[in-house]
């Protein structure tokens, strides 16, 4: 004969009856399948938080183990999409048998993409931090996508000062009005011709998008769009011609943090299925011991909670 195990969540009375906004678990590891552009899915491990609302005031607590099982059954087996996330949220609510009217899931993972060099046939891999927070409350869905883009920024002011220093050095080095082209190019490419260089630094764009309903964009395509918008994404494996091409890209895209922010703003304003956005660009200055930042968000976005 099987032993009946006690279940105090259903047998004991609640000392102080009250509903609770969210109850659940955090830091669960779940393997997920991320769709890739024309490729097989990427299999990554996501740190997952899962919650349901406790709307029944006199209930001792939620059925927590059922949340764990639903995560495994759906996220662990199906392709990550708006469809699978919506199905998961609905199943989480149903699993509570009337205790809950809302469910929420947070996913944090790193998506690794293959990146080709600018000119050569070299390639490497780059990891992008991704966060997805999706919730369904009384039939209303809300999804927030977070991602980080790393890029290079070269200071326009520093570039102008470096050019001026080079111009002054040329004037001092060559007295005659007519300068030999070969002599000038030979001097510029020599050690003495390296008069000054503009400062540049690794920079980051931290972006949060509130999506329309439960729509989930193709992540590799979104990352490519944002990197193209900024113009100077960091590279992986490079040869000398790639490094030179990257130097030219930086010269063509001199930018203060305000310039990078305005580029992102224009792109996000035109992006379909984006209801709200919040972003911060951060230039980790090599000239200073502090960072230069710019923050922007839509009028109806909440700066503190996005």
From Swiss-Prot:
Family membership: Belongs to the GTP cyclohydrolase IV family.
Pfam families the UniProt entry points to: GCHY-1
Protein task: Converts GTP to 7,8-dihydroneopterin triphosphate.
EC code: 3.5.4.16
GO biological process, one term: tetrahydrofolate biosynthetic process
Keyword RNA-binding appears in the UniProt entry: no
A Gene Ontology molecular function term of the record: GTP cyclohydrolase I activity
Enzyme class: hydrolase
Chain positions of site May be catalytically important: 155
Recorded superkingdom: Bacteria
Full protein name: GTP cyclohydrolase FolE2
Keywords: Hydrolase
Pathway given in the UniProt record: Cofactor biosynthesis; 7,8-dihydroneopterin triphosphate biosynthesis; 7,8-dihydroneopterin triphosphate from GTP: step 1/1
Reactions catalysed according to its record: GTP + H2O = 7,8-dihydroneopterin 3'-triphosphate + formate + H(+)
Organism of provenance: Pseudoalteromonas atlantica (strain T6c / ATCC BAA-1087)
């Amino acid at each position: 004969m099987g032993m009946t195990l006690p279940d105090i969540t259903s047998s004991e009375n609640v000392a102080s009856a009250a509903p609770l906004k969210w109850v659940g678990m955090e830091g669960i590891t779940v393997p997920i399948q991320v769709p890739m552009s024309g490729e097989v899915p990427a299999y990554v491990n996501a740190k997952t938080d899962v919650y349901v609302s406790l709307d029944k005031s006199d209930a001792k607590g939620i059925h927590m183990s059922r949340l764990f099982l639903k995560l495994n059954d759906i996220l662990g087996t199906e392709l990550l999409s708006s469809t699978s996330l919506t199905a998961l949220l609905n199943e989480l609510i149903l699993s509570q048998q009337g205790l809950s009217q809302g469910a929420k899931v947070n996913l944090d993972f790193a998506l690794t993409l293959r990146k080709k060099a600018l000119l050569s046939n070299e390639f490497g891999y780059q990891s992008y931090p991704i966060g997805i927070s999706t919730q369904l409350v009384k039939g209303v869905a809300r999804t927030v996508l977070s991602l980080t883009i790393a890029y290079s920024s070269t200071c326009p002011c520093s570039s102008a000062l470096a050019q001026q220093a080079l111009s002054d050095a040329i004037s001092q080095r060559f007295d005659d009005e007519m300068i030999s082209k070969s002599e000038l190019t030979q001097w510029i490419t020599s050690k003495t011709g390296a008069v000054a260089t503009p400062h540049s630094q690794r920079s980051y764009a931290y972006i949060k998008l509130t999506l329309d309903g439960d729509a989930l964009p193709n992540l590799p395509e979104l990352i490519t769009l944002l990197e193209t918008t900024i113009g100077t994404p960091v590279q992986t494996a490079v040869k000398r011609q790639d490094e030179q091409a990257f130097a030219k890209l930086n010269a063509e895209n001199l930018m203060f943090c305000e310039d990078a922010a305005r580029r992102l703003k224009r792109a996000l304003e035109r992006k379909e299925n984006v209801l709200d956005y919040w972003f911060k660009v951060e230039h980790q200055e090599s000239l200073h011991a502090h960072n230069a930042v710019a923050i922007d968000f839509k009028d109806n976005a909440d700066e503190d909670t996005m």
